[in-house]
A protein has these predicted regions:
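Hydrophobic/basic alpha-helical segments
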Residues: 1-210
Length: 210
């Protein structure tokens, strides 16, 4: 009745812990690559599943999810319980939980802008008129007014423009006008693969500051 995620995160933690115990048990007989594939398939996939719903959860909830990822990194790399984990996460090239959530929201926003699908998300975002921005050289979204309800400010409708407009200009470059009759009217210049690659590079510095 409080629309909290404590019970869901507790259940997720139990499920991941079960797989982590098995991974630690077999880790001495598996090489790093195999252990990494198992970890990604069985545990990291659970952390990423519908993780956009975790957007802007209280820090204590995000920290519980981060503990799972930290333990997963230790299991893969055979680190001890109290070894400093940040260098390990960096070496694995993993975004931390908060940045993984932002990555999901921004990638959904990209898809909605580029393809117009899914329609139920595309209808929630509005391109800002170039005349009302400092520069018309990149794609900016209109930001809705903040609500007094905290749960409303966790919605895609509110947070997608906030996260999108915080991206550097090179990720928001508009596509050049189409000169053919292909019927494709892309909004953004970068292809999906290039956008996601550069987005991860951008978010990585927030997960692992230099």
């Amino acid at each position: 009745n409080k629309l909290g995620f404590d019970q869901q995160i507790a259940a997720l933690s139990r499920s991941c812990s079960y797989h982590l115990r098995d991974l630690r048990r077999i880790r001495p007989t598996r090489n790093f690559h195999t252990a990494n594939v198992i970890a990604t398939s069985l545990v990291q996939s659970k952390l990423d599943y519908c993780n956009s719903l975790y957007l802007n959860l209280p820090a204590h909830c995000i920290n519980k999810l981060q503990v799972i990822q930290n333990n997963l990194a230790r299991a893969i790399t055979s680190k001890r319980k109290f070894d400093h984990i940040s260098p390990t996460l960096r070496s694995l090239h993993w975004l931390k939980i908060r940045e993984r959530i932002n990555y999901k929201i921004i990638s959904l926003t990209y898809s909605a802008l580029q393809s117009g699908k899914p329609h139920y998300l595309r209808d929630l975002i509005t391109l800002q008129s170039t005349r009302s921005t400092r520069s018309g050289s990149f794609i900016t979204l209109s930001r809705p007014p903040a609500s007094k309800l905290k749960i409303s400010n966790r919605s895609f409708y509110y947070m997608a423009p906030v996260l999108w407009n915080s991206l550097p200009a090179h990720l928001r470059q508009p596509a050049p006008p189409s000169s053919d009759n292909s019927g494709q009217n892309n909004t953004l210049a970068l292809s999906r693969n290039k956008f996601l690659s550069q987005l991860k590079t951008y978010l990585f510095k927030f997960s692992h500051p230099p």
